[in-house]
């Protein structure tokens, strides 16, 4: 994520700010310009209609029907207005989703909503299992997220129970968007699908059997040599989604570190490494950064920021993901359901 500043006074700001902490200027985030802009009284833009409901600070054209930004418009189900606890969880989830959408935009990956593709477009159902039966997952372009994952205590309990080193709302979004891009980009390409089978296995293998086998017997011995997480061992589709999520972790963390002066300036999204050595360059920058950040976390008494090892087999899978992202990006202008400011 980029480093942001107030255009009026230069105050350093965060992605989430809707007002300058120094001069008080009203601000909004422009996805098209990847910047915070001052909202003048006579501006032809305004803040998203979900400013209060989802704490959304994104800009939309003033004449846009519905007034929802290109992130919020992708959500097709949310808690009811009477569910105050659910709405608080919803706001936290939308904040994580905005970070996801901004990164996908930076990577120039296609973001096609249901209004453009009613049958297969991207959509989100953000609902809480505290009030109904909700299972996090992806199906035919629709990502469902259990908002209970936004509760720190609940999420930490699940993390410990499932023996996971890392579990966050943003991580869930990145995992599920991996499923979406398999559905959107890989399944429809014979060339990509062939390479997928070589690296990840059969995506059509019985999922229920794989799920039962995983939770009954756990990951296979020596899984750390070939998989980024124990959950990735369950099924080829989960291996892809887990590896895709880690690719997004790495790219966004490198971009943020570069903007903050903690990594080479060439690690930002707007200065992508090119050519056959591009992926190697990314990893060569990531390994010393992640090690250093882990040591900083330990110095503060926290667990490692990135508690994962990337063996050669995982890097080959991730290299394929990088190739797909690199090849599909020129074919898609950033596509959103509404005009992008």
Swiss-Prot record:
Gene3D superfamilies: 3.40.390.70. This is Uncharacterized protein Mb2598c. It comes from Mycobacterium bovis (strain ATCC BAA-935 / AF2122/97).
